[in-house]
């Protein structure tokens, strides 16, 4: 049974088989998660990605992870050329990412909150979509036994807690002062969940 965890911190620091980049169809990595991955792992990641462009919205491609601790970067094409996104694009890009992860045989995989940075997609809706797709795809992905949602800040952390909790109301407002997520962006915190245990509530 796969383990799902929330982590408040930089996805580039994670020692997993593959991290996911929220990519656009041109695959340039200048801003957001892509920019952070390129700065931490080197320009070679972007060069390898751009060689595969242009790509379709909702698809996913694989490159090495450069000097990062991860082995691969899976670029989830969740943003169009103008860096706009939609729920459908996020869902399709996630499904494509899981397909690439199965091909690679990855055991551990880390996602950012797709589309919620430069794409401006609502955090609560992104969390619900991503958690729903994850619970649908993990049973089809037998090699994956550890999945992390790598988030930055209280608001994102709380919305994914809500999406994973069987007791929380969908779309509930964020209340940072009542959240168990850490206030400091550089202070990672982990909450464990088990895929397939009801709606993904706390283990």
Model-based region annotation:
Residues 81-203:
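Phosphate/ribose-phosphate-bearing ligand recognition and processing surfaces
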Residues 1-103:
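Glycine-/small-residue-enriched capping loops at alpha/beta junctions
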């Amino acid at each position: 049974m796969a383990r799902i965890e929330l982590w408040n911190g930089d996805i580039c620091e994670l020692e997993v088989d593959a991290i996911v980049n929220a990519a656009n169809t041109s695959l340039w990595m200048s801003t957001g998660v892509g920019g952070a991955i390129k700065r931490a792992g080197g320009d070679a990641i972007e060069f390898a990605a751009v060689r595969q462009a242009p790509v379709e919205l909702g698809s996913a491609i694989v490159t090495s992870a450069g000097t990062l601790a991860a082995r691969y970067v899976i670029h989830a094409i969740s943003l169009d050329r103008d860096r706009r996104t939609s729920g459908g694009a996020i869902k399709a890009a996630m499904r494509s990412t899981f397909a690439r992860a199965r091909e690679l045989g990855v055991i551990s995989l880390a996602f950012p909150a797709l589309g919620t940075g430069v794409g401006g997609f609502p955090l609560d809706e992104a969390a619900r979509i991503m958690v729903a797709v994850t619970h649908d795809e993990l049973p089809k992905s037998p090699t994956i036994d550890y999945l992390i949602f790598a988030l930055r800040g209280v608001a994102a952390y709380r919305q994914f807690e809500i999406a994973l909790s069987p007791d929380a109301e969908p779309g509930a407002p964020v209340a940072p002062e009542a959240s168990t997520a850490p206030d400091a962006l550089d202070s990672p915190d982990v909450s464990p969940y088990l895929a397939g245990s009801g709606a993904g509530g706390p283990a």
